[in-house]
Amino acid sequence: MWQQVYDPLNAPVLSALVAAIPVILFLLSLTVLKLSGLKSAILTLVVTLVIGCAVFGLPIVAGAGSVLSGFLSGAWPIGWIVLMAVWLYRIAVRAGNFDTVRASVSSITEDQRIQVLLIAFCFGGFIEGAAGFGIPIAICAALLVSLGFNPLKASMLALIANAASGAYGAIGIPVTTAAKVANLDTAHLSAGMVPVLHIFVAIVPLLMVAIQDGLRGIREVGLVALLTGVIFSGGQVGVLLFLGSSELADIIPPLLALVVLALIMSKWQPKHIYREPTAPTLEEVKAQQGIKHSAGEIVKAWSPFIYLSVTILLWSTALKPLFAANGPLGVATLTFPIPGVHEAIVTGAGKTVTATFSWNTLGASGTAILVAALITILTSKISWAEAFEEFGGTWNQLKMPILMICLVMSVANVMNYAGMTTSIALALATAGSLFPLLSPVIGWIGVFVTGSVTNANVLFAGLQSTTAAQIGVDPTLLVAANTAGGVMGKIVSPQSIAIAAVAVNSAGEESKITSMSIKYSAILLVLVSVWSYALSLMVG
């Protein structure tokens, strides 16, 4: 067996800086060199393998196994989810009901500062709570484009909106996982999320309005945006404190915020109606509104997304035990070890690394979306031939972006199995009493590398808890800070960027989306970091 070495250069800070080269390289490739996401991923993977093997001593066979593991996890479940989500969207468009979708949104408000809150913030928050894995980013970005938003701007707004709900995605898995890894009570950690994160959740709608329309937007609809954020965040606080449940934190509050916002819009509209430059003009929208749609037609138009919501919620809750390893349908899950990695690596703490791949054919979220797509085909005017034609178009649209996702996951796995990610975290952990200031940065790095708040918590929740005990800070605070920093990292994680780009048919434009989004991710990270440090001084 090979044991990970976290300080191969006998200088913790220098070793960490070398370990961070892939993260820095990926960002520079996208933002400075303006390379496509695919080229950036290839370059970063090559450099990561060289550093992992030559500097950190990762055996070549383990490096190959890490890449294999990355490709498998990138293809399934992530690639499968993206493929099915985009196919469902294309089926919905091909079915010919999108004029009704647009009209139904415009009937609530023609102001696109509010439309983005309805779709990306509220509806997207609910989808994140039910499914996660980038599904709300893909679906909401595509819906915004259908309303006339610029594709790249729609992607950025969907990514930023996702920061409000990313901590509790897929029925609260990031928090429940963090509690398990850090040996904390789940209800206690859920309550601990409140002071760390929820002031920032409340201001996300304000940020989205400011991005669209600057100070004028804040003056005209800022109060409504803030109220939406407070209801969303306040609902999450209520669920976390009184129910002690992170599982429902992205289910009830987004729907509550959506209903309240729609009710407000039924009684009030801004004097100045904001339209995106690329969207249909107000006159064109009003002309379209002259065509009356019945309630049945509106439900029919939205039915693909209703089916999506129902199926992913069922897959995540009621049906989940059926797909478990010991469940009636567990036989549909094939699990096998990753050669060169499984039980071939020992961590610095002496723990043997297990690395397996589980092909959960029935229980995957992508399969839930497949069911929603099949129901849509059966209940709409689209023929099977047209549906399969759309699938072919979807595959041609996604094959390169899915390859990029596989490469990104390979980078993450090489860094993890080589001990590079842990090297960065351990170096930051030497900051002593200043560590709470850097705690969210570790979560940010974890999500940037892995693309998942859950994975970042698997990697670092234990480190955060241990370091907290050493410096006399409540472990709950730092584990919560790790999660909070992670959701800010999701805004620019290569995996999320790739999903957003492909959803709006802008594959190859990842560098532009990253450049547009990174400043907001950085600002939110700085705010969370300073706030976490202040909390550590106040409550310890």
What does each of the following model-derived ranges do?
Residues I291-G446:
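Transmembrane helical segments that form the transport core of multi-pass membrane transport proteins
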Residues D7-I21, G74-I78, A130-P136, A187-A202, ...:
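Structural signature of hydrophobic alpha-helical transmembrane segments
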Residues R113-G125, P151-A164, A187-P205, C406-L407, ...:
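Alpha-helical transmembrane segments of multi-pass membrane proteins
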Residues A64-S73, I78-L147, M156, K381-T467:
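Membrane-embedded alpha-helical segments and adjacent helix-loop junctions characteristic
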Residues A167, I171-P280, A484-G540:
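Juxtamembrane and boundary regions of transmembrane helices in multi-pass small-molecule transporters
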Residues V237-L329, G348:
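Active-site loops and adjacent core secondary-structure elements that bind or stabilize anionic groups
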Residues V18-L28, L35-F56, G79-A85, A225, ...:
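Hydrophobic mid-bilayer segments of alpha-helices in multi-pass membrane transport proteins
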Residues L35, V93-F98, E110-D111, L144-K153, ...:
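Juxtamembrane helix-boundary/capping and inter-helix hinge elements in multi-pass membrane proteins
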